[in-house]
Design a protein with these regions (language model features):
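Glycine-enriched, solvent-exposed interface loops adjoining structured elements
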Residues: 1-65, 131-267
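Small/polar beta-strand repeat architecture
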Residues: 63-135
């Protein structure tokens, strides 16, 4: 099904008129459909570790080469053009004899920063790297993939069975995956916008969720919107999850429901 057909399915659930093209029509139904499409799609994708929207990738931190190290009143001053750090950032330093470890930075300008609480000592000639790391609690941070909706698992070994419900500890904050792995193998739900790949049960769930938003936007705050959302949460989403789990090792705490029950809710 196309995006327009899915939105039309949602509109049909609330008695709305069908659209010819969801991206170009100018009717109130089309405007509302476009307004809530992204919200509903991201919510539905986040609700389950869908097989059709799963990607796996390897993330590895990249260290930045240091240009020079000098003495600034007893503190270690590091020079690197466009270093990208701000005061308060934490950096892990390697191969600088007087500053091996992690330090908080004081930004001097775009090309230099000092290491707080460091003690300069002679002996540096060249080389060394730095890496921006979380301020506390974790050893590394990896930028989220640009198409990531939700991170599902982070492991340290590509041969580890990522279909099982196990993962190394991690946390997602401000566009980064925080963990203790320099190289992380990540399974995540990606923002799959190819509606032709959506299973029928997911389409039914998505259109029902979208209808709950459209009902309130087009008809005002009424019980219809809440009723449709309940149908999504209690019936359509569990049904889609059940179908997804049967394709392989998925989440096992799922329920299934019949299409007849779905039809009766909208009779």
């Amino acid at each position: 099904m196309t995006k327009t057909e899915i939105i039309n399915t949602a509109l049909a659930l609330i008695g709305g008129k069908s659209l010819a093209n969801a991206d170009t029509d100018t009717t109130p139904q089309a405007v509302s459909g476009r307004k809530f499409w992204e919200l509903a799609l991201n919510e539905a994708l986040s609700a389950q570790n869908w097989n059709f929207a799963t990607k796996r990738t390897r993330l590895k931190v990249t260290r930045t080469a240091i240009t020079s190290v000098t003495n600034n009143g007893g503190l270690v001053r590091i020079t690197k053009v466009s270093h990208g750090l701000v005061t308060g950032d934490r950096a892990a330093i390697e191969n600088v004899p007087c500053a091996v470890g992690s330090f908080f930075a004081t930004r001097i300008d775009a090309d230099t920063f000092d290491l707080q609480d460091s003690v300069f000592a002679s002996g540096y000639s060249s080389g060394g790297t730095f890496l921006k790391i979380p301020a506390f609690g974790w050893s590394y941070q990896h930028a989220l993939p640009s198409d990531c909706v939700k991170v599902r698992r982070v492991v340290d070994d590509p041969d580890r069975d990522m279909e099982e419900n196990d993962t190394e500890p991690f946390r997602v904050e401000s566009g980064f995956i925080l963990c203790d792995l320099e190289a992380a193998f990540v399974a995540y739900t990606w923002r799959n916008t190819d509606t032709a790949t959506y299973p029928h049960e997911f389409i039914a769930a998505l259109s029902t969720l979208l209808a709950s938003y459209l009902a309130q936007d087009l008809a005002g705050p009424a019980g219809r919107s809440a009723e449709i959302r309940q149908t999504y949460e209690r019936l359509m989403l569990p049904n889609a999850r059940g179908r997804d789990a049967r394709e392989g090792k998925g989440d096992t705490n799922v329920n299934t429901a019949s299409s007849e029950l779905h039809a009766s809710r909208f009779a």
